[in-house]
Amino acid sequence: MSYVPIVIEQTSRGERAYDIYSRLLKERIIFVCSTVEDHMANLIVAQLLFLEAENPKKDIYMYINSPGGVVTAGLAIYDTMQYIKPKVATLCIGQACSMGSFLLCGGEKGMRYSLPHSRIMIHQPSGGYQGQATDIEIHAQETLKIKRLLNELYSKHTGQDVKHIEKSMERDNFMSPEEAKKFGIVDNIISSRNATGLLTK
């Protein structure tokens, strides 16, 4: 069982307790710090929509430390990031692999960051369906469609040619922050909050 710290704040009405993630949400900070799956994606989508309702003109900061996960869950988060009015800055802490790197790449252009010792990994989607031969073929075709979709979206956000994206994602492709910047996944590598005014209140 994971432990989530509680922080206490003094208000005019007395003390108020928050779990650490709820307190950071007040500062418009969202954490994508686990495997990307449906339940987690629903929570992230809800937070994005909540922050838009709170202030549609104020930026949102998404911190990513994720090994990746389910493509459709990641696309739900990605589509919401593009749909809402606030700009979404993304910052890789630790790792952004698979769908984690996709979400990192999908942040607002010029507002995609990595800390200096993070790792970023891209690869093609994988499937593991079992069943009748016809159903396996159907799922294989769907996986290929998803592969083409992700290639096109990576191309859109990185500026790389689709063929170069496809070749780069043929196998697990690990990158340093410098390599990810050259590839177009992130815009800047930062080592302190002072390195960018965007992450300073």
From Swiss-Prot:
Active site: S98, H123
Assigned EC number: 3.4.21.92
Annotated PROSITE patterns: CLP_PROTEASE_HIS, CLP_PROTEASE_SER
Membrane recorded as keyword: no
Entries under Gene3D superfamilies matching the protein: 2-enoyl-CoA Hydratase, Chain A, domain 1
Keyword set includes ATP-binding: no
InterPro entries on file: ClpP, ClpP/crotonase-like_dom_sf, ClpP/TepA, ClpP_His_AS, ClpP_Ser_AS
A Pfam entry, by short name: CLP_protease
UniProtKB keywords: Cytoplasm, Hydrolase, Protease, Serine protease
GO biological process, one term: protein quality control for misfolded or incompletely synthesized proteins
One GO cellular component term noted in the UniProt record for this chain: endopeptidase Clp complex
Subcellular location as annotated: Cytoplasm
Role noted for this protein: Cleaves peptides in various proteins in a process that requires ATP hydrolysis. Has a chymotrypsin-like activity. Plays a major role in the degradation of misfolded proteins.
Family in the record: Belongs to the peptidase S14 family.
Assembly mode: Fourteen ClpP subunits assemble into 2 heptameric rings which stack back to back to give a disk-like structure with a central cavity, resembling the structure of eukaryotic proteasomes.
Name the record gives this protein: ATP-dependent Clp protease proteolytic subunit
